Amino acid sequence: MYSDLQQPGSFSRKIVRYLRNNKTHSLHKPVRKHFKRRRIITHYPGQIIQMDLIDLQKFSGSNSGNRWILVVLDSFSKKLWMRALKRKEGVETADAIRSIFHDMDYPVQSVIFDEGKEFLNSSVNMLFAQFNIHSYHIRTKIKAGAVERVNKTIKNIIWKLFTETGKHRWIDSLNDIQDNYNNTYHRTIKMTPNQVTRENRKKVFKNMFPEIDDRINCRLQKGDNVRVALNKETFDKSYKVNWSEDIFTIEKVFQRLNVCWYRLKDQSGNIYPKGKYFYQLNKV
């Protein structure tokens, strides 16, 4: 490895090859957690909506017993609907979602949410079946990003309201907050959420995804052998093994919107349908 010190490029490439082939280094290599992931691609209002809850339990005494805000976001138009909840039980959550569906100007095709019991219950499932809606719940630690960002925006507005009024009452302002959000210019769609319709959806799509046809060079290729990052809890020791003992082979490479992801197969030829990103793989 050290025989060609006059050629720095050659020297660095040899180090990379050595480290890739060194099992100890390969297993303990740090895992990068924050990186660019695939975006949700939608083509019209109602195609995909996201749901989440804002936890305001500690202010329930000032808000007539209301403890939560149900947040529903249309991924295409960025339009927002909110409902106050006293309990996050199945029946109350389903009733709130139903009232939002009735307020919408278009049918909903798919819903995305996390694994909270407020959404994973028979009452909500029956509601989705009634409206012929496909539902998907997120099993990873990466939540539905768009609605998470909206939650932060809404909480920021509510906390400013607390400061301005000197009180912790938000329930009376919920509709005004919703209307203000939906009439505010959104830089992604280059208009307000209330201005988005099915008639101008092509313009909105072009504003959202101008780079949809761009091509990039993916850093891993079909046939490369890799280890897979282990799912570790927040407080797991960083010096423990970070990568799988088993070695997988990249079976297919995908890319869209300047993001690459990879489908893997194990040494027995079994294909794993769920894709992995570059930073979740460690080439060996």
Residue spans of the language-model regions?
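Retroviral integrase
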Residues: 8-156, 187-284
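Generic recognition of well-ordered alpha-helical segments
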Residues: 153, 157, 176-180
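DNA-recognition alpha helix
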Residues: 1-6
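Short, charged, surface-exposed loops that flank catalytic or proteolytic processing sites
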Residues: 162-176
